[in-house]
């Protein structure tokens, strides 16, 4: 989503600098292809983090960006610390980016606690979901200004593509008549692959394609296939009929569901994060951690006649085009930054971010 946002801002004449805390990271090459300047820090250990903070502070002083936008918990905290070390320049708005709703406190509780204590530092906190706002306020975040900006989906890339559909199905030995459900998610407890696979075992008439890092090691039923990490998700989605999300917690805005809808797939999702808002009454919304309910929703979508399922998929795409385009997301970020006091103009670097 960071890549999409930077692309949308560049299209509006705003040069971008992204600071990556993971070195090359998964997005660095894509950002550089767009023309974004990527600064790689990749801190290791306490000493490395201190050096990275100093480097980031020097970068802020040098670039004097209109906005220093954090991204995820680590990025938010690094942005806050470096902004302070740089003297908290008045002409650089500090903003945070929350990308999740409820989390596993055992894994992320320390980061959440630090964020809670520092949540008054940024001039703006942006969440990609109302569920994320509600969760963080309940956890004690007290930001000065909040904005909910849903993710933007590239509907040119994610679209119905008969040629891509036919090619991938031939590659995987799936007929054009087969009903195919796409699950795009890394292997992580929040994505709840166990519930998905339990539901899949109850629906032998549906073929399941699992795309995401870690999925190749899963024990799968006969009607499921793992594709591992893929950089061509647009092609994977185009080959499907149903976009399915089995997340148990932690989702803010589900890109996988929205991208599948943009590709013309009917959605089946658990009611986690803002999934209900994304679906907008389309497809099926089921409780999390309920394999029977998920299996029944999949049955309902799979037994639709093919023309009815295609029509439902086109309605899903129309919803994403109307409500969740990349251009709309970029405009919402610009409006939120300006409302929080950012002065965006001139010809120099405008924003910086932490990845």
Indicate where each model-derived feature is located:
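Short hydrophobic beta-strand element within catalytic cores of glycosyltransferases
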Residues: 19-20, 266-269
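Short His-centered aromatic/hydrophobic patch
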Residues: 70-76, 98
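Acidic donor-binding loop of glycosyltransferase active sites
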Residues: 238-252, 265
């Amino acid at each position: 989503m960071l890549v999409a946002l930077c692309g949308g801002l560049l299209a509006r004449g705003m040069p971008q600098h992204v600071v990556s805390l993971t070195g090359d990271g998964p997005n660095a090459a894509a950002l550089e292809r767009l023309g974004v300047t990527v600064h790689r820090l990749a801190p290791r250990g306490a000493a490395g983090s201190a050096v990275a903070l100093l480097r980031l502070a020097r970068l802020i002083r040098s670039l004097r960006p209109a906005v220093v936008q954090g991204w995820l918990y680590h990025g938010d905290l690094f942005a806050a610390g470096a902004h302070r070390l740089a003297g908290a320049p008045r002409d650089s708005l500090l903003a945070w980016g929350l990308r999740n709703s409820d989390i596993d406190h055992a894994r992320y509780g320390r980061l959440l606690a630090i964020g809670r204590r520092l949540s008054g530092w940024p001039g703006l906190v942006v969440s990609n979901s109302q569920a994320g706002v509600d969760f963080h306020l309940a956890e004690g975040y007290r930001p000065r200004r909040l904005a909910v900006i849903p993710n933007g989906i590239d509907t040119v890339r994610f679209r119905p593509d008969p040629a891509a559909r036919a090619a991938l199905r031939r590659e995987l030995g799936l007929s054009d008549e087969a009903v195919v459900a796409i699950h795009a998610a890394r292997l992580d407890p929040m994505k709840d692959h166990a519930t998905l696979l339990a539901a899949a075992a109850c629906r032998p008439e549906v073929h399941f394609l699992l795309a995401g890092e870690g999925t190749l090691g899963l024990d799968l039923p006969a009607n499921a296939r793992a594709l591992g990490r893929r950089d061509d998700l647009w092609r994977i989605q185009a080959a499907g009929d149903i976009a399915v999300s089995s997340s148990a917690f932690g989702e803010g805005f589900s890109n996988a569901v929205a991208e599948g809808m943009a590709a013309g797939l009917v959605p089946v999702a658990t009611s986690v994060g803002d999934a209900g808002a994304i679906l907008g009454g389309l497809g099926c919304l089921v409780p999390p951690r309920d394999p029977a309910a998920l299996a029944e929703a999949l049955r309902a979508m799979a037994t639709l006649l093919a023309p009815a399922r295609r029509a439902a998929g086109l309605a899903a795409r129309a919803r994403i085009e109307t409500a969740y385009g990349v251009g709309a997301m970029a405009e919402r970020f610009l409006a939120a930054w300006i409302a929080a006091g950012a002065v965006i103009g001139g010809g120099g670097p405008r924003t910086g971010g932490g990845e």
